[in-house]
Structures are given as structure tokens and as C-alpha cells.
């Protein structure tokens, strides 16, 4: 008889129970909530990752419950092989409190969070890890090590962040970018932000048509609202091949991007309206507010990833639950395996 095990903390736990060979006992009250409906999109992503080899991942400063259990849970799903970097005594303490056996995980001692970030970047530069995962430290502290000119992980692309979102009221997952890294991006920055998101969506989507909506407050171009000028320029850059592999349209107000009815009511004819895969926001402030409004008021499920660096960086909010950290790890795995497939003859593979 299989050992009974109550796993009901996150929406991924029924799948994990099957993987561990335990009996899943669901919560007493089960409601088909908007959150549950949205979560199904991410469960499908997790199932698609089944069979991929776990990627070595440097977990930076995992000294609280969520960051440690997020890495451990992703390891249980065989998505990542975590290397825990931080004050060893603090990692061991939080592991003990949360009944985590560290025997199967490598721990690298680092006295402070900035030292942990530096060591993670060094491992990535040496190709000893395939991804970096943010733990209990500020985003700017981790990213300062990533973008450091001398020993960082910059590429020819602008580094940007993408939230993969799913809500019950929209038929498919979509990306919001950039809501975490670039505060007030220039037009040239936005070109890279858009291209990074397109490349990610092509990895995620089985339907290869990708549609990008460049958002502003209105759908007409006016010098009074400079973001409409950027949106129009980005659309033309896609026409000229400066942005590739997607249909890009803008400026579009949010309602026109996600609702065909709203677009038709305003007389807007766009191949993107009502079917956007990517929402490009004007700046970090508007994007961050949009993503968090969807999460807290719209019961959205979300995952976060940094793009454009030498390795994917799993970047979630310190308030994000464990399941969202796991899905963020899935995105990193998809990115790594896609890159590996393109370079399958390279001797630089680390797995």
C-alpha cells in the first residue's frame, strides 16, 4: 500500500504526489475558482517539461521558506538540480524548520547575499550552471552582479524581464514585458525587450504565430503621448525586419489588445486585437502595476524570467508562492534546452 501523504499547499501538488508515488489528499473544499482555471495553463507547461533532464541551477541566498522550498520543489519535479549558495548555517536552519533534507543538494557557503550573487554569476560564466535562481535578496542586488561590466553575464542584447501570465478570462498564457528590470527604456531598449519576449514565446507556444501588442493609453499616434510614438516605431521596425518572427502592432490600449469586441467597437482593425501573446508596456511602473493588478485582483497565475543574459535568470517576487517559482524554473529549462538543441554539436554543454 502506498504511503498516504497530504500535499495541498499549491496547485501543482496533485502532480507531485503522482511523481513521488504518494496518495494525494485534496483540501476539504475544492472550488473551480478563476485561479484554478488559470493554473491549468501552467500545469500543461509543467507536463510538457516532463522528460527533460534537470538543469543545474545556482540558487542565490535561499534563506527563507519560499525560496528554499521553491528550489526543492522544482528539484522534486526533476526540473532543476539546485546548487544552494548562501550562508550555510542559515540555509541549514531554514531547511531544518521546514523538514528539508539537504543531503542530496550541494551547498556553497557565502557569508552575504552579494557574495552569493557573485559566486552564482561565476558559476554561470564557467558554464557550471545553466541558470540562476533568485532567493531571498533584492532584485537589484542580484542583477548588479549579472550586468557587471567586467565579470557579468551581458550579451549583445539588452537584458529584460518577462512575466508569463495566465488568467481565467483569457484563453491562453501571455507575456507582460518589461515590468521588473528596465525602468524607462529607450526605443532601442524596447526593440530588444520585444525580441527577447518573442523568442521566449516561440519556445512556449506550439502554435508558432506570435502576436505582439505595444501598449499605450490610446490607439492613435500623438506627440502628446510619447509612448505612442515608440509603439508606432516598433510596429514599423517589425515591418522592416528589425524585429523578427512576430506580428507587432501598436499603439494599442489595453482593452483593444485583449478584446476583439473593444477593438471593433472603436473601429480598430488589427491582427493582434483580442489575440495578443505579448503585451509590451511603456515602462516598468505601468507594467509592474498591471501584472500585480492581474495577480491580486484577477487571480492571475504568473511566472518570471530574465532574458538576454548568458543564462536564464529565474526572477520572482519575494511574495510569490512556491508553485510560481516552480513554473519559472520550467521556463528556464525550456530556454536552456532550446539553446542546447540549436548548439547540439557544441562541446560546451554542461549537462
From Swiss-Prot:
Keywords: Acyltransferase, Cytoplasm, Transferase
GO terms classed as biological process: acetyl-CoA biosynthetic process
Major enzyme class: transferase
PANTHER family associated with the record: PHOSPHATE ACETYLTRANSFERASE
Entry superkingdom: Bacteria
GO cellular component: cytoplasm
A Pfam family that the UniProt record links to this protein: PTA_PTB
Catalysis performed (reactions): acetyl-CoA + phosphate = acetyl phosphate + CoA
EC number: 2.3.1.8
Family to which this protein belongs: Belongs to the phosphate acetyltransferase and butyryltransferase family.
Entry's Gene Ontology molecular function annotations: phosphate acetyltransferase activity
Subcellular location: Cytoplasm
Chief localization: cytoplasm
Pathway: Metabolic intermediate biosynthesis; acetyl-CoA biosynthesis; acetyl-CoA from acetate: step 2/2
Full protein name: Phosphate acetyltransferase
Naturally occurring in which organism (per UniProt): Rickettsia prowazekii (strain Madrid E)
Any coiled-coil regions, as ranges: none
Signal peptide start-end: none
Amino acid at each position: 500500500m502506498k504511503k498516504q501523504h497530504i500535499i495541498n499547499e499549491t496547485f501543482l501538488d496533485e502532480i507531485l504526489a503522482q511523481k513521488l508515488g504518494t496518495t494525494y489528499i485534496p483540501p476539504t473544499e475544492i472550488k473551480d475558482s478563476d485561479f484554478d482555471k488559470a493554473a491549468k495553463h501552467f500545469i500543461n507547461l509543467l507536463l510538457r517539461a516532463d522528460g527533460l533532464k534537470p538543469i543545474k541551477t545556482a540558487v542565490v541566498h535561499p534563506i527563507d521558506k519560499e525560496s528554499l522550498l521553491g528550489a526543492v520543489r522544482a528539484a522534486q519535479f526533476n526540473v532543476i538540480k539546485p546548487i544552494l549558495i548562501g550562508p550555510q548555517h542559515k540555509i541549514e536552519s531554514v531547511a531544518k524548520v521546514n523538514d528539508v533534507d539537504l543531503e542530496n543538494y550541494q551547498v556553497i557557503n557565502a557569508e552575504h547575499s552579494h557574495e552569493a550573487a557573485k559566486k552564482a554569476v561565476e558559476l554561470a560564466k564557467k558554464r557550471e550552471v545553466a541558470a540562476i535562481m533568485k532567493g531571498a535578496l533584492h532584485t537589484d542586488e542580484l542583477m548588479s552582479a549579472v550586468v557587471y561590466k567586467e565579470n557579468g553575464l551581458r550579451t549583445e542584447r539588452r537584458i529584460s524581464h518577462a512575466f508569463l501570465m495566465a488568467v481565467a478570462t483569457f484563453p491562453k498564457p501571455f507575456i507582460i514585458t518589461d515590468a521588473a528590470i528596465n525602468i524607462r527604456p529607450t526605443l532601442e531598449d524596447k526593440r530588444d525587450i520585444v525580441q527577447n519576449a518573442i523568442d521566449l514565446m516561440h519556445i512556449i507556444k506550439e502554435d508558432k504565430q506570435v502576436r505582439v501588442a505595444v501598449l499605450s493609453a490610446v490607439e492613435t499616434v500623438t506627440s502628446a503621448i510619447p509612448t505612442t510614438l515608440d509603439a508606432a516605431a516598433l510596429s514599423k521596425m517589425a515591418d522592416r525586419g528589425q524585429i523578427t518572427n512576430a506580428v507587432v502592432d501598436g499603439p494599442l490600449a489595453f482593452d483593444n489588445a485583449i478584446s476583439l469586441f473593444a477593438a471593433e467597437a472603436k473601429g480598430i482593425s488589427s491582427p493582434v486585437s483580442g489575440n495578443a501573446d505579448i503585451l509590451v508596456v511603456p515602462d516598468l511602473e505601468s507594467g509592474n502595476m498591471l501584472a500585480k493588478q492581474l495577480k491580486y485582483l484577477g487571480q492571475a497565475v504568473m511566472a518570471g524570467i530574465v532574458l538576454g543574459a548568458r543564462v536564464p535568470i529565474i526572477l520572482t517576487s519575494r511574495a510569490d508562492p512556491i508553485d510560481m517559482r516552480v513554473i519559472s524554473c520550467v521556463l528556464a529549462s525550456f530556454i536552456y534546452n532550446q539553446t542546447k538543441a540549436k548548439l547540439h554539436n557544441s562541446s560546451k554543454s554542461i549537462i
